[in-house]
């Protein structure tokens, strides 16, 4: 396993839970809020805790640090691993220098994951990252993504990726249908492409390109270790 020591950051950003004409209505079942498609050989279960790191979709495969999370569930992408803001949004800062990264390899081992087909290789997380109190720590079960506080990973009404509840916030579009690809990327439905959109000195994460300052990324699943 290749070890990468990455910086983690967290910042506070608020997002109101407003109802939407489409999406989740409080009191209704939310586990059926899934995209219509699914990615080939995506593993809908990974019970070992993992983090996610932003990897730019470029020829050099430059990767940021792991994503962090602030106290209310916001996910933040720094130039290192992903953090989580206190209000549940996923965000990333812009200060760290991107580092090159090898593509995550696949493995036949099935100790911690459950692939959708017996003919599919199970994802093996090749990269590791140091974790701290702001690191976004995840588990995946039956296509539902949860953080260390048990909140549900969802795409909310403005297409932003964040954690709430359970249940997810009113108007949420997707709250299930997550998987990890054979290459080790987080996927939602049939897509493993997400978007980071610059907001001040950090990036918010979305499932669609919502503005000119957004760029396409992969979210690489990484092992988390105490350093």
Curated annotation (Swiss-Prot):
Each PIR1/2/ repeat, start to end: 65-78
Region (Disordered): 83-127
Main localization category: secreted
Keyword set includes Magnesium: no
Outcome reported for the amino acid change (mutating residue 68 to A): Does not affect cell wall incorporation
Gene Ontology molecular-function annotations: structural constituent of cell wall
Source taxon at top rank: Eukaryota
Annotated keywords: Cell wall, Cell wall biogenesis/degradation, Cleavage on pair of basic residues, Glycoprotein, Repeat, Secreted, Signal
Gene Ontology CC: cell periphery; cellular bud tip; endoplasmic reticulum; extracellular region; fungal-type cell wall; fungal-type vacuole; plasma membrane
Keyword Cell membrane: no
Site (Covalent attachment to cell wall glycan): 74
Residue(s) at site: Cleavage: 64-65
Cellular localisation: Secreted, Cell wall
Compositional bias ranges of the Low complexity kind: 83-124
Record note on modification: Covalently linked to beta-1,3-glucan of the inner cell wall layer via an alkali-sensitive ester linkage between the gamma-carboxyl group of glutamic acid, arising from Gln-74 within the PIR1/2/3 repeat, and hydroxyl groups of glucoses of beta-1,3-glucan chains.
Positions glycosylated per UniProt: 68, 78, 105-107, 109, 111-114, 116-118
Annotated GO biological process: fungal-type cell wall organization
Residues excised as propeptide: 22-64
Functional description taken from the UniProt entry: Component of the outer cell wall layer. Required for stability of the cell wall and for optimal growth. Required for resistance against several antifungal and cell wall-perturbing agents.
Family under the similarity heading: Belongs to the PIR protein family.
Note: Present with 12500 molecules/cell in log phase SD medium.
Domain notes: The PIR1/2/3 repeat is required for the covalent linkage to the cell wall.
Protein name listed in UniProt: Cell wall mannoprotein CIS3
Organism: Saccharomyces cerevisiae (strain ATCC 204508 / S288c)
């Amino acid at each position: 396993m290749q070890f990468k020591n990455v910086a983690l950051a967290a910042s506070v950003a608020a997002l109101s839970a407003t109802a939407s004409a489409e999406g989740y209505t409080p009191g209704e079942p939310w586990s059926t809020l899934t995209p219509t498609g699914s990615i080939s050989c995506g593993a809908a279960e990974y019970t070992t805790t993992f983090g996610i790191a932003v990897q730019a979709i470029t020829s050099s495969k430059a990767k940021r640090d792991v994503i962090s999370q602030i106290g209310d569930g916001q996910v933040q992408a720094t130039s290192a691993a992903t953090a989580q803001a206190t209000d549940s949004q996923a965000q990333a800062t812009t200060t760290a220098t991107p580092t090159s990264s090898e593509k995550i390899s696949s493995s036949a081992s099935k100790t911690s994951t459950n692939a959708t087909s017996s003919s599919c290789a199970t994802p093996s997380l090749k990269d590791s990252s140091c974790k701290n109190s702001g690191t976004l720590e995840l588990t995946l079960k039956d296509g539902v993504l949860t953080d260390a506080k048990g909140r549900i990973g969802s795409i909310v009404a403005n297409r932003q990726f964040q954690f709430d509840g359970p249940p997810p916030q009113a108007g949420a579009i997707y709250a299930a249908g997550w998987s990890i690809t054979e290459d080790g990327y987080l996927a939602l439905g049939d897509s493993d492409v997400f978007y980071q959109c610059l907001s001040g000195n950090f990036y918010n994460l979305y499932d669609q390109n919502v503005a000119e300052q957004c760029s396409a990324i992969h979210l690489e699943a990484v092992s988390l270790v105490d350093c």
